[in-house]
């Protein structure tokens, strides 16, 4: 007579978890007889979670089962156990300097899991750096492609984002205050009409026949624009 065939059922326990469904490499094993060789179980997998074993009871009590012994000669039902959601780091490369550091908003996450925001979208807010326009977060150091404004929690991988900046240019306006004809004051051509936060800008005094010129701002004599200055 033929040996009795016993059933094998697999419960992945993934109905309440976020993200893609779990994968069971043992799914083809649906039954056995006492004449079959023992079956060594393979771990299931699920993005965002660590597999912690197959159990022979729904309460996940006792030790995990690693092999089905065919001499047990009974129907089997195995249950997958999963870890808490794995935490993935989010790293921000600010591409700034010690003299003028950038800041990342506190609202930008430093870690996330597949269940963050209910498994939905994680938003990246702009960084700030004095004297620069923020052009976006990029997922590569070469700034190839477009900037990234958000990513799905279901990516379940470590993230690194690179800040891209464009230095701001500020206007310089000169008011020469009076004179006419040969006595018209002159602003030396070497004086720039724009400047940036990086590097001091020396200012050559205005020239007027018979006068000594100085530049004044808010009642103070100005001989240069100091490094670190901003604004028109």
Where are these regions (language model features)?
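Secondary-structure capping and domain/repeat boundary segments
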Residues: 1-232
């Amino acid at each position: 007579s033929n040996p009795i065939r016993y059933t094998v059922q697999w419960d992945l326990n993934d109905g309440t978890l976020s993200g893609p469904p779990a994968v069971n490499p043992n799914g083809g094993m649906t039954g056995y007889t006492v004449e079959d060789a023992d079956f060594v179980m393979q771990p299931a997998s699920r993005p965002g979670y660590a597999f912690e074993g197959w159990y022979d009871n729904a309460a996940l009590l006792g030790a995990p089962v690693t092999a089905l012994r065919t001499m047990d000669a009974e129907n089997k039902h195995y249950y997958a156990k999963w870890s808490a959601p794995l935490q993935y780091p989010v790293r921000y490369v600010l591409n700034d300097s010690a003299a003028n550091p950038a800041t990342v908003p506190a609202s930008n996450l430093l870690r996330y899991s597949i269940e963050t925001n209910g498994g939905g979208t994680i938003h990246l807010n702009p960084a700030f750096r004095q004297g620069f326009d923020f052009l976006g977060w990029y997922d590569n150091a070469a700034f190839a492609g477009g900037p990234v404004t958000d990513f799905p929690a279901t990516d379940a991988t470590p993230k690194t984002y690179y800040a891209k900046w464009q230095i701001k240019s500020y206007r310089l306006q000169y008011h020469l205050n009076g004179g006419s004809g040969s006595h018209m004051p002159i602003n030396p051509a070497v004086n720039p009409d724009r400047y940036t936060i990086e590097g001091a800008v020396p200012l050559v005094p205005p020239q007027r026949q018979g006068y000594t010129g100085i530049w004044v701002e808010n009642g103070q004599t100005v001989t240069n624009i100091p490094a670190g200055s901003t604004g028109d």
